[in-house]
């Protein structure tokens, strides 16, 4: 049995007292709201989801990210549809609750796809023996997940350290860390890197949905046709009834988007016993790049806001989201702006048109740079064993979650 986490530092508890007070104040504005707190957040427009990555399977990092963002107050943690990853998310949530017992546990969501063309479900692959030994390794430098590790080693019988041809490259892609962003594909000067796509097994997905530690599912679809979605939906069968929320992630495919969404919703209605959500996927896996990455998801929201025939459900931004997303939403007049809508499970109510924001690459980046500070000799470190780093990571997470939730500005920890 793992030892209990160290007592939380006083500053951590103080910061959470302020966070909880702010959250309580927000909940108080919806007196009489008997929906789960996650749904109440969607109605207000202050839902926040952490995206660990549909293909990111580094359990140690997922655990620490889940711990930190649970403490920061996210409503949902979205992860790969893999049993070990789901276990890591729940372990992180449990440790967060042991540090601050009053913390709200987020829903755990698994992500699957109906089509191998979805960019979130692929891994980079190459053979380092095919790489020239004098390669400058741009793939290693550009990877946001530190998923490529290459080292030049000497070839037996050759002893010149100064001559690159006397060595070879070893290593390659760290598969569990690669989440398919594709940035390495375009920078390889020798075109040696391939993207290997895959589709999650619906049978294994159905088994995960029957567990008591999975609350939601997100189905990624390309918007290129409903047949594959319908097939996946049929294969999941009654297992879909075990979750509280069903999300569909899709790109803006232009004028046909709303018709496609309505066709999907018609299929879903046969088993839709809980809540449903539409994830507006703007520019996938790009939030860590910079300010402009968030434009596409906000434009998608603006597009749908003018469509009176859009299907019922909550709406949430993703794909390129970062610290500039709220500013862009405000400029568009869509940040926590209410509308009269019918939502599955919540009928005829005033609620925010954009229920919230999902943060992926950017959220992982700002906390990940703290995780990387933990000395390497600790191996797969538990961040709670390093209180100073935990506080620093929490400060980073709060800087992202706080503006959506309306938390008071906290002093530097």
Locate each region found by the language model:
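N-terminal amphipathic alpha-helix/helix-capping segment at the start of soluble metabolic enzymes
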Residues: 2-53, 105, 410-413
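Extended, intrinsically disordered, low-complexity segments
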Residues: 13-28, 39, 117, 355-413
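Active-site mouth loops of central-metabolism enzymes
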Residues: 44-61, 113-134, 167-176, 189-203
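Conserved mixed alpha/beta catalytic, RNA-binding, or beta-rich assembly cores of soluble enzyme
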Residues: 61-63, 75-81, 182, 186, ...
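Non-catalytic positions within long, well-ordered alpha-helices that form the structural scaffold/packing
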Residues: 70, 132, 140, 144, ...
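Glycine-rich loop at the start of a catalytic domain that most often binds anionic cofactors/ligands
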Residues: 89-97
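Glycine-rich, aromatic-flanked loop segments that form ligand/cofactor-binding clefts
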Residues: 97-124, 157
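Iron-sulfur cluster-binding cysteine motifs and their immediate structural context
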Residues: 136-166, 171-172, 182-199
